[in-house]
Structures are given as C-alpha cells and as structure tokens.
C-alpha cells in the first residue's frame, strides 16, 4: 500500500504556485539545441511546469530540464512545449508537459510538492 498523499483526491497533476530554479535546453523537431538558459518556475506539478524565458520557442519543441527543488534535491526531466504565450515582446511564458522522468525524480517531485501542502 502506498503512502497517502494530500494530492490523491485532486486532479492527476495538481499545480502548485512555486518558484524554483531551472536550467533549460530547448530542442527543435530535429533535436537541435535552439536555446539554453536559466529561469524560475511559475508553478510546478508532477506532470509539468511553466516558466518565463526570453527564448522564442514553439509548441512541440522538446526541452531538457534540470529542476532545483531545494538546496539538496535536483531532478532531470524531459518535456514537450505544450503552449507558449507572449505577455510582452521578448518574453515567452512556456507551458511544459513532462514526458520522460526516472521514477526517482518523480518521487522527489511528489515529496517536494507534499512538503508544500497545507
């Protein structure tokens, strides 16, 4: 039997408004790196994240992320750009859906999110 989570009775991947540092590497449909950088998340869930960056990326681009959950825990995930909004010229709010993540990374994200639960 698995441990009960605050999120068990909510949507599959609840979003938590939390700023954490990430390193990103956007790749086009040919797997060519088109932009790398550092940003902070606007929210985070076990299924994805969103953040603001200056990279003009497109929906369906692949992104490799290193997410710094806290001072000790960092996880690497691969995701797909689900949507892009342009709040101001030169700024891109990017929604990422996680695609590939080791179980250990998923467990760290769940533990981190549970630590933020009321």
Task: Spell out what each predicted region is.
Residues 18, 37, 63, 75-77, ...:
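Hydrophobic core residues within well-ordered beta-strands of beta-rich domains
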Residues 22, 79, 96-98:
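A structural signal for short, well-ordered beta-strand segments
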